[in-house]
Amino acid sequence: MFKHVLLLLIAVVALPGCLSSDANDQESTKVCKPLSFTMKALDGKDVNLGKYQGKVVLIVNVASKCGLTPQYEQLQALHDKYSEKSLAILGFPCNQFLWQEPGTAEQIQEFCRVNYGVTFDMFAKVNVKGDEACDLYKTLTALDTEPVGPGKISWNFEKFVIGRDGEVVARFSPRTKPDDPAVLKVIEAELAKEV
């Protein structure tokens, strides 16, 4: 009898937790769209990424002291060439890869302006991997996109292309340059689509 009471007690105590877990699992499996988040700009102001809806968006995690930092020049060239056609480039500084972005917001902004003439939108420093990753990057890395697929960010300058419909259409590795023909093909195809 004691065994039955104990089992009943365990079931009563555990059941709400299981049900709660199911509800939380269902909630956590809802995939948010990347442009549904509000992020801090480099100047500290909140930016609702929904303002980019209807544009083609290139999201890149960036760093000032990385071997790939010269990609800022190509990102700026893309901005210069395509911003009038509704391409938005969003740079997200990150210090998670060998501490290659140690600067303050002011230092990052100055570095980008002086060395690369950056005028595309830059955001406050974020984490892009691990438990501390911001929700935007948790969403981006959960998606199965071509050619890289889902999974953690491998290094600075990983690139995500978001179409006019707000869906991620491509993900490119850090070593794939912003002006690589594969990147340009995706961007131009998305720009050609009607809003």
Language-model features: locations:
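Thiol-/selenol-based redox modules, centered on thioredoxin-like
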Residues: 135-138, 142-195
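N-terminal "domain-start" segment that seeds a small globular fold
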Residues: 21-50, 70, 135
